[in-house]
Amino acid sequence: MTDKTSLSYKDAGVDIDAGNALVDRIKGVVKQTRRPEVMGGLGGFGALCALPQKYREPILVSGTDGVGTKLRLAMDLKRHDTIGIDLVAMCVNDLVVQGAEPLFFLDYYATGKLDVDTAASVITGIAEGCKQSGCALVGGETAEMPGMYHGEDYDVAGFCVGVVEKSEIIDGSKVQHGDVLVALAASGPHSNGYSLVRKVLEVSKTDPEQFELEGKSLADHLLAPTKIYVKSVLSLIEKVDVHAISHLTGGGFWENIPRVLPEGMQATIDESSWQWPAVFNWLQQAGNVSRYEMYRTFNCGVGMIIVLPAEQADEAVALLNSSGENAWKIGVITQTDAGDAVVIN
């Protein structure tokens, strides 16, 4: 016999009991996201989900995303309750631009040392995002990895699968001269451009919790959860002929709108049709950021753009506003042989 210390996984920095405690904490909120197609509960090796029976030729649409360095800001400010909504929003908004209804969502949560309260707060936010978008949170992975992350830092990633009728896929192929662009207002910077946000905070020596804009702290503006457009857009698709949808994420106006335009089509944006929310004016002024860079990095108050026939634009705006969105006509599509795919006047 030797007198060597008997080591455990916990001695190495992995607390299985904490992981089990987390699962117990989140079971209730996860259950609230359940859809009838989901078979079984948490804890299986894989999640089972049937396809909704209303689809004749169902096409699965998948997506994965994170929340970028907005997470760093949330960790620095110790605000973990809405970052999960951001995570879901970034995934499901990408799915709905193709006309897809989100079915189920999985998350990946990685940290050096698992803090059950923090993780539960994040996952509760994920469940809230799933409820807002009508998809089921069917599982996830919580990875406690000592030595991989500094202090209490963590990272999150999301994975979503949706379904769309094959004949109703929205891919931009129907976009034509004369179509109108309808904008959906953003709730803030959403989940893009936060490395620049943090640089502006640093250079301007601004404390986001002390500095106020329009009666709210800058921190509240910056950490406002990403708007989830799924239910409003799916409802709209049933009533009007949507030709294309663009989710304004990384790359802003210049890169995301061209992704859904056929060759030879140009989107002309009327800059006078809306006012930038105060947070974007502050970012531009405090960081001396050029107009071009603002439109390349941020959504500037526009979270999503829908392209549809001119004769249906007013109806679409009315339908979207009645469903709780702030929508307006922001531009038009013209045919062009040369020039940029997006022009902002």
Swiss-Prot record:
InterPro entries recorded: PurM-like_C_dom (IPR010918), PurM-like_C_sf (IPR036676), PurM-like_N (IPR016188), PurM-like_N_sf (IPR036921), PurM_cligase (IPR004733)
**Catalysed transformations (reactions):** 2-formamido-N(1)-(5-O-phospho-beta-D-ribosyl)acetamidine + ATP = 5-amino-1-(5-phospho-beta-D-ribosyl)imidazole + ADP + phosphate + H(+)
Q: Where in the cell is it found?
A: Cytoplasm
Q: Name one GO cellular component term.
A: cytosol
- EC number(s) per UniProt? 6.3.3.1
Pathway(s): Purine metabolism; IMP biosynthesis via de novo pathway; 5-amino-1-(5-phospho-D-ribosyl)imidazole from N(2)-formyl-N(1)-(5-phospho-D-ribosyl)glycinamide: step 2/2
Q: What class of enzyme is it?
A: ligase
**One GO-annotated biological process of the protein:** 'de novo' IMP biosynthetic process
Record flagged with keyword Magnesium: no
Keyword terms: ATP-binding, Cytoplasm, Ligase, Nucleotide-binding, Purine biosynthesis
Q: Which GO molecular function terms does the record list?
A: ATP binding; phosphoribosylamine-glycine ligase activity; phosphoribosylformylglycinamidine cyclo-ligase activity
Domain of life of the source: Bacteria
Q: What family does the Swiss-Prot or TrEMBL record give for this protein?
A: Belongs to the AIR synthase family.
> Cross-referenced PANTHER family, in alphabetical order?
TRIFUNCTIONAL PURINE BIOSYNTHETIC PROTEIN ADENOSINE-3, TRIFUNCTIONAL PURINE BIOSYNTHETIC PROTEIN ADENOSINE-3-RELATED
HAMAP family, sorted: AIRS (MF_00741)
* The protein's name: Phosphoribosylformylglycinamidine cyclo-ligase
Q: What is the lineage of its organism?
A: Bacteria, Pseudomonadati, Pseudomonadota, Gammaproteobacteria, Enterobacterales
Q: Which gene encodes it?
A: purM
